Regions:
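Generic alpha-helical secondary structure signal
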Residues: 21-23, 30, 89, 113, ...
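...with weaker cross-activation on analogous glycine-rich loops/strands in unrelated enzymes
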Residues: 6, 10-13, 48, 56-149, ...
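Active-site nucleophilic cysteine motif
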Residues: 35-54
């Protein structure tokens, strides 16, 4: 088990966003490794680059593979949309026709919020990558129903020892 605190995860997500902001452009599928090394970063790339810097990712993967990885690493999957307001973590959305499948259409990192809006880091388009982030005061359903909440990956808490991710068996 490799330990990582919530503050450390927030910091590596910030570093991944700063990397994207400084030198990357959007690509629908970023299959480079390390993620973003080719100057491209999709929305899942933010998650993968952060996890690579934290030592949990060792290869390029697509969005669906990354979603499976989160469970394998020991993140807790929450299907309660209210957790987006109260927790930090990777939030995943899908198009309505993908509900009930494993497919994910968009990923961002939530920093929690006030019950109406959240703050977040988000890549996946040049305007997002070029923006000053974290975004603050964003409505959770900013897509007006074109995307629906799928789930959120949250770090499990370990009493008195920070937060741990499961790596390997």
């Amino acid at each position: 088990m490799l330990a990582i605190t919530q503050e450390q995860l927030d910091a590596v997500v910030r570093e991944a966003y700063d990397h994207a902001h400084a030198c990357c452009h959007y690509a629908p599928t970023d299959r480079s490794f390390p993620v973003g090394e080719d100057g491209k970063m999709d929305c899942t790339g933010l998650m993968l680059r952060a996890l690579w810097w934290a030592g949990y990712v060792d290869r390029a993967m697509n969005c669906d593979e990354a979603d499976q990885l989160m469970g394998d690493l020991g993140f807790v999957k929450s299907t309660d949309i209210n957790d987006v307001y109260t927790h930090h973590g990777f939030v995943q959305w899908c198009e309505p026709h993908n509900v009930g499948t494993e497919h994910v259409n968009h990923t961002y990192y939530s920093l929690g919020g006030d019950g109406r809006t959240i703050s977040k880091y988000d890549t996946g388009s040049d305007p997002r990558i070029d923006a000053v982030q974290p975004y603050v005061g964003v409505p959770v359903d900013e897509w007006g129903g074109t995307l629906v909440f799928k789930h959120m990956w949250i770090l499990p808490e370990a009493p008195d020892k920070g937060i741990y991710l499961k790596v390997g068996d």
